[in-house]
């Protein structure tokens, strides 16, 4: 009996759950099912809370006026109950603006307390599934990667190059096509409840100047799950460019 309980505890541990997802992610033909039940594991929220609390920017109050430091076991239990019967509905994010380097303002969407906590659990799950399939040339919003690792790779790979072209996808986060994103997720995830939850986040809308606005496209900057969704979306572009570059090299070699 004690052995059975110990095994059950190990299998419930967030580390075990996420490592199991990562191991299966190596097989690109593997379809992930029954992901949604991970949200019923209280321990996932303890880990999520610790990770969020470690980042000062995540302490900003959402549209509900509450911060992540107001967590309690009762709140987690209520959240899990609403997830089990799928009555959970994310609140609209609070729109605020921060200055950009060019003097313009960048819109951010700050999620409500419960949404922030749940988004971190979603982010951990998606990272475990997708991180190893991302291209090595991708450095944004990834563990142990940054603009500094990108510059280091450029220095090593393009030592003889004198000119570089810098580009930006205008309004990228605001213009992500929801249906395309959902289609990409379904290539690896065969869990409709999990997909429906992602849709809820995408369609939650935002509040600005006390007015509600629908979100027909995009995923708000400032949302905890937004960066990983953006990387999943852009991974298709990375893989296309990798294949295109290989074709160019092949063509040059043939000439």
Enumerate the predicted regions with their spans.
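Non-catalytic, polymerase-adjacent accessory regions of viral genome-replication enzymes
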Residues: 1-77
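Generic recognition of stable, solvent-exposed alpha-helical segments in well-folded globular domains
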Residues: 12, 16, 30, 34, ...
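Reverse-transcriptase-like RNA-dependent polymerase core
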Residues: 52, 82-104, 113, 117-125, ...
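Short, conserved non-catalytic motifs in the polymerase core
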Residues: 56-69, 90-117, 133-145, 165-166, ...
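Conserved catalytic palm subdomain of right-hand nucleotidyl-transferase polymerases, strongest
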Residues: 58-67, 109, 148-185
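Short helix-interrupting loop/turn segments at helix-coil junctions
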Residues: 126-132, 191
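Nucleotidyl polymerases of mobile genetic elements and RNA viruses
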Residues: 174, 179-248
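Conserved small/polar residues in nucleotide/adenosyl-binding loops
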Residues: 249-255
